Amino acid sequence: YLGATVQVIPHITDEIKRRIKGISNDIDIQITEIGGTVGDIEILPFLEAARQIRKELGQENVMFVHVTLVPYIGPSTEMKTKPTQHSVSVLRSSGISPDVIVLRSDRELNDEIKSKVSSFCDVSFEDVISAPDLGDIYEVPLKMHEEGLDKSVDTRLNLSTNEPDLEKWKNMLHLKAGVEKTVEIAILGKYFGLPDSYLSVVESLNHASLHNQVKLNLHWEDSDNFNVEDLNKFDGVVIPGGFGYRGIEGK
């Protein structure tokens, strides 16, 4: 920086924008997730960079989808929208107004809740999306289509797309639900402290089991403390790669 004082704005925000814009020039749509919680100090530079990107690329080329939690209060049997209202208010104070609000909850949200969020957060009713917990993560695309999220994106970005053909996806879920045979697979690893350490391996096994019409039953075996003979009870063993001494020894 040639001796200049390095500041959050513009230096850090400019670098964030450079990385977001520099992913590829050969794409039609780019999805950029900004994690964390609105209001946290760590997220402020990213929100400012996102605000600037919309200004630079044009309102018609950028949309903001805000995901919030709608908790269920058991004793009063109520779904509380106040956290969502507060979150949107804080987000707006950063200069960003969400185009779509996705409401995460442990159950389906009725039109009354969605209408309330629409009214208090100044978002069209059609752009308030219910995203309840589902039995299978692969049901989510169908649920988002049912809620009209794809139509909201099409409208906001002026896209001209046809109705998606989801029959193969539906058939895949139908086949998955009808599987009866089970296979026992062990993952022999070291990094079990963080659940997502072997996420790609687990998802690959899920895809393989679905393709072979079997139900996957996973077992986690610590490579630092296991008996080789115990592996005989499994139909298969997966040994993921690792790093350094602990990534090799014991495997």
Can you annotate each of these PLM segments?
Residues Y1-D28, T32-K251:
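N-terminal beta1-alpha1 cap of cysteine-dependent amidohydrolase-like domains
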